[in-house]
């Protein structure tokens, strides 16, 4: 029987860290190895094909930074993790130096997770890649690695989605001291790829099959609707990790341990005027999501 490789395909600022802790710490469904996010597949795709769209130099510089972080196993100061999910974990029993280098290949990726699985298989059901940039992988690239991955793994894909406006507000808080103007700039221009939930779902379904892709609605999952994910993974949950983003408390959110990446992002509260401004101009995102997913979650657009 092949081991299961769980691919989490974002999205950032939608509680991927609490989801990571729920599956990999609190319940021991899967283990991610040396770190949560190495962005290996994104680096591999970008390394093979730098798209020259007028921002080619910027993308190369970004790729260089990702490679440097990969080679030093550095996730960033704001992504401090519990020991069990770091390179110092009792479950990480190899150095991974061949994988954590600037020279990347799909063969190294496969070997890394097969090696890790053999070390954890008595305690965990699967291995996992929780790199948020998996959400940005192109359909063409995923098709190019699909057969090789399926030779060695059963692939399951999850992705967690938060109300688009509230998520974009957290992004704006993180990226600018003036989030009101920043979010209006985003709404009036080209949005980041993470905003297009429908496209993320469609690309992954087209490659891995709808039966192997499970979108999670953040607000619903943390409100208690956990059984659909448990059924998808064929694994019962005994605990759901706390989530700074639910219930949404804005700047008054609790400072839970190991979730600084969440509570540092909402320093200014979303006011009604800004929310309504964004909802009016981003209604197409909600409608596109409905077309792909089948409905707009009741807790969105509030």
Regions found by a protein language model. Give the residues of each.
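PAPS-dependent sulfotransferase catalytic domain
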Residues: 28-29, 37-38, 46-47, 54-57, ...
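A generic "structured core" feature
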Residues: 2-12, 17-24, 28-30, 39, ...
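PAPS-dependent sulfotransferase catalytic core
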Residues: 1-124, 130-131, 208, 235-288
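Surface-exposed cleft-lining segments at the edges of enzyme active sites
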Residues: 95-100, 129-135, 180-192, 265-274
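Alpha-helical packing segments of well-folded alpha/beta enzyme cores
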Residues: 105, 109-116, 141, 197-201, ...
């Amino acid at each position: 029987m092949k081991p299961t490789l769980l691919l989490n395909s974002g999205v950032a600022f939608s509680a991927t860290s609490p989801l990571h802790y729920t599956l990999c710490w609190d319940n021991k469904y899967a283990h991610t190895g040396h770190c949560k996010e190495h962005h290996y597949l994104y680096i591999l795709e970008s390394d093979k094909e730098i798209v020259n769209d007028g921002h080619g130099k910027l993308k190369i510089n970004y790729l260089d930074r990702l490679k440097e972080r990969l080679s030093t196993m550095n996730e960033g100061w704001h992504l401090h993790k519990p020991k069990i999910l770091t390179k110092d974990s009792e479950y990480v029993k190899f150095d991974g130096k061949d994988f954590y280098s600037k020279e990347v290949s799909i063969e190294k990726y496969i070997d890394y997770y097969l090696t890790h699985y053999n070390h954890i298989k008595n305690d965990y059901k699967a291995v996992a890649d929780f790199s948020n940039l998996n959400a940005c992988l192109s359909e063409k690239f995923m098709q190019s690695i699909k057969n090789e991955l399926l030779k060695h793994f059963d692939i399951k894909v999850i992705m967690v989605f938060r109300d688009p406006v509230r998520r974009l507000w957290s992004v704006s808080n993180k990226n600018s001291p003036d989030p009101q103007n920043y979010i209006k700039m985003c709404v009036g221009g080209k949005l980041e790829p993470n905003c297009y939930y429908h496209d993320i779902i469609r690309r992954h379904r087209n490659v891995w099959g709808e039966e192997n892709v499970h979108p999670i609605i953040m607000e619903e999952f943390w409100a208690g609707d956990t059984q659909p994910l448990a059924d998808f993974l064929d694994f019962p949950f005994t605990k759901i990790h706390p989530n700074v983003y639910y219930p949404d408390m804005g700047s008054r959110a609790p400072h839970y341990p190991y979730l600084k990446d969440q509570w540092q992002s909402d320093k200014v509260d979303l006011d009604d005027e800004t929310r309504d401004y964004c909802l009016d101009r981003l209604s197409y995102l909600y409608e596109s999501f409905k077309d792909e997913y089948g409905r707009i979650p009741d807790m969105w657009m509030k």
